[in-house]
């Protein structure tokens, strides 16, 4: 009876391990097929798909995270952290193995990016260097942000707490976001606030620029409070 129980337990462990390996392999295979094209669409500096796969730290970090996350889900927490720490040393990007990362997530440049344990990053999100998806409380529950499909997080932005960044939203460079952002909105500043339609025309390109964001937000607030402006 005892031997049968041990044999059954060993079989379940082996089955679980094989299932984890199979799942991780499928995710990595998908990433290898999809990530180079996703990066090329967003980075004009790319010369080839081989360059993306072998030399881009954001791609390496995502692929390593697939392994770390698979180990984390299999309760192999030490091994998972070892993989994530090795990835951080190589890429400069820190993704906790518990974080959920979707498909075609582009981490551009990537140095200094930190993604916390309970963060959720959905498909087609773009994250630039220096971004923090962090927690605000020392609790063992959901405490990191959820980034919905297609959102963009600009250089050096901090998105903190169990909040939601809506689909296709854009977070300006250097912004500090402490509350939910609606789908499709553009926000900037410290603390971040939404850029009004009049101000959005002042923001060049697809991702809000920190200086332009600050100027636009100041002008909106000054206008709303009847503060006189000095024109050059």
Where are these regions (language model features)?
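Terminal amphipathic alpha-helical/low-complexity segments used for targeting or macromolecular assembly
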Residues: 1-91, 202-232
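Solvent-exposed, flexible loop/coil residues
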Residues: 50, 57-58, 63-66, 99, ...
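Left-handed beta-helix
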Residues: 91, 96-97, 102-103, 108-117, ...
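Conserved phosphate- and dinucleotide-binding cores of soluble alpha/beta proteins
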Residues: 140-144, 200
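Extended alpha-helical regions
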Residues: 165-168, 173-232
